[in-house]
Swiss-Prot record:
The lineage of its organism: Bacteria, Bacillati, Bacillota, Bacilli, Bacillales. One of its GO terms (biological process) is valine transport. Branched-chain amino acid transport system which is involved in the uptake of isoleucine and valine. Probably does not transport leucine. Together with BcaP and BraB, plays an important role in the activation of CodY, a branched-chain amino acid-responsive transcriptional regulator that controls the expression of several dozen transcription units in B.subtilis. It is found in: Cell membrane. Keywords: Amino-acid transport, Cell membrane, Membrane, Transmembrane, Transmembrane helix, Transport. It comes from Bacillus subtilis (strain 168). This is Branched-chain amino acid permease BrnQ. Belongs to the branched chain amino acid transporter family. InterPro entries: Brnchd-chn_aa_trnsp_Livcs. GO terms for molecular function: L-isoleucine transmembrane transporter activity; L-leucine transmembrane transporter activity; L-valine transmembrane transporter activity. Pfam families: Branch_AA_trans (PF05525). The chain crosses the membrane at residues 9-29, 46-66, 80-100, 121-141, 149-169, 196-216, 227-247, 284-304, 321-341, 348-368, 378-398, 414-434. GO terms for cellular component: plasma membrane. NCBIfam families: livcs. The gene is brnQ.
Length: 440
């Protein structure tokens, strides 16, 4: 029998969602957005909140709504092979390709680089990442409550310090907001919309959804309706907190340009703003907190990805996979944070439209009676367009295709050219399913 989930526990779940999404790695994007957007910071931030806050929480709700046990079973609604391929690519993105290396980069940029001389050699990054990921690997191979205790203890301190930092920045801004940089002078909302992809949160949300469902079931929530309602309420709490923090961080970045100039990445912005307000002690405290927070994130991601790939390839041991992921992440991290962000954008521009389409089709599943053709048509059309978006972002421009897409696809120039084709593909798929039913 289903039990009522208390309001206090819903708040706890909401705070847990906030803590899960407001990771150390994601702190770097709003300040950089603010720096580049300048006087258009509020418009750009609104776009960022859509994909950096709204979409991830919508993804979690969609996962709960689907009633599935994991992402692979949900994605298999498109096709079993797609389920495996999409889930594998997603775990690679939130694992050794981007998210795990990024955690090491952010730790270095905030916890180590500010204390090095300007002419420090790249060897310092190599040494740091080897030590960082060796420790992360060791902890993932030997599961211990220590990492959970440190995480639980550190999270409130980290949030308090970041909250204090942005509060001071709001009360006593470093300087006045400057003119927007190139790329944010027009269509700043859609630029911010795409920048929200960099958080990877809409992809990670499918994994977090499993955690939320299990937590709610332990509290006695068993019916699908109850799970959805409770999840939606918890998501709303997390959304408000995330929106407030991201907006404050964006403003902090925007107001820092007059004094600090345009910096290389968001980690550098955080480090220099912290040093500006709190001196060297503030920089040391921020560096320690971010480094430990990123370490716990890395351990969690290595563990989750290793478990997934071990299930996919049971003949390869969990420990071997964890070691390979750690070594690979070390290599990737040494291209540097700024370059890693640049490399990740083309991939995310290709992946996100597919993920967004899957989210909305999940909510509409009963409307089109779960017909496979609808999923396949919508995601195929979205993928074709998003693939060219990704290629364009990577500097591979096929002028003929870009010219045709610009002429025939609404919103193609702002990165949303896939939207109408995704809808059209779903409609075509539905018509095809009716035709197949009649001819069978």
């Amino acid at each position: 029998m289903s039990k009522k989930v208390s309001a206090s526990y819903i708040i706890i779940i909401g705070l847990m969602l906030f803590a899960l999404f407001f990771g150390a790695g994601n702190l770097i994007f709003p300040p950089m957005l603010g720096q580049l957007a300048g006087k258009n910071v509020w418009v750009a931030n609104a776009g960022f909140l859509v994909t950096g806050v709204g979409l991830p929480l919508l993804a979690i709700t969609a996962f709960v709504f689907s009633g599935k046990q994991n992402l692979q079973s949900l994605a298999s609604r498109v096709h079993p092979v797609f389920g495996i391929v999409f889930t594998t690519i997603l775990y690679l993105a939130i694992g050794p390709f981007f998210a795990i290396p990024r955690s090491g980069n952010v730790s270095f940029e905030i916890g180590v680089k500010p204390f090095l001389s300007n002419d420090a050699s790249p060897v310092s990054l190599i040494i740091f990442t080897i030590l960082f990921f060796a420790l992360a690997c060791l902890l993932s191979l030997n599961p211990s409550k220590i990492i959970d205790i440190v995480g639980k203890f550190l999270t409130p301190i980290k949030l308090t310090f970041i909250g204090l930092l942005v509060a001071v920045a709001l009360i006593r801004p470093i300087g006045t907001i400057q003119a927007p940089s190139k790329g944010y002078t027009s269509q700043a909302f859609f630029k911010g919309f795409q920048e929200g992809y960099l958080t990877l949160d809409a992809l990670v949300a499918f994994v977090f959804g499993i955690i939320i469902v299990n937590a709610l079931k332990e509290q006695g929530a068993s019916t699908k309706k109850q799970l959805i309602v409770v999840c939606a309420k918890a998501a709303a709490i997390a959304a408000v907190l995330l929106a407030v923090m991201y907006t404050a961080l964006s403003y902090m970045g925007a107001s820092s340009v007059e004094e600090l100039g345009i910096l290389e990445n968001g980690a550098e912005v955080l480090a220099k703003v912290s040093s500006y307000y709190f001196g060297s002690y503030g920089s040391i405290l921020l560096g320690l907190m971010i480094t430990v927070a990123c370490l716990t994130t890395s351990v969690g991601l290595i563990t989750a990805c290793s478990s997934f790939f071990h299930e996919l390839f049971p003949n390869i041991s969990y420990k071997k996979i964890a070691v390979v992921l750690s070594v690979f992440s070390t290599l990737v991290a040494n291209i540097g944070l700024t370059q890693l962000i640049k490399v990740s954008m083309p991939v995310l521009l290709t992946m996100y439209p597919i993920a967004i389409s899957l989210i909305f089709l999940t909510f509409l599943h009963s409307v089109f009676k779960g017909k496979t053709e609808v999923y396949q048509g919508s995601l195929l059309f979205a993928f074709i367009i998003s693939l060219f978006d990704g290629l364009k972002a990577a500097g591979i421009k096929i002028e003929v295709v870009n010219r045709i897409f610009t002429q025939i696809l609404p919103m193609y120039n702002i990165g949303l050219g896939w939207l109408i084709p995704a809808i059209a593909g779903g409609i075509c798929g539905y018509i095809l399913s009716i035709f197949r039913t009649k001819t069978s």
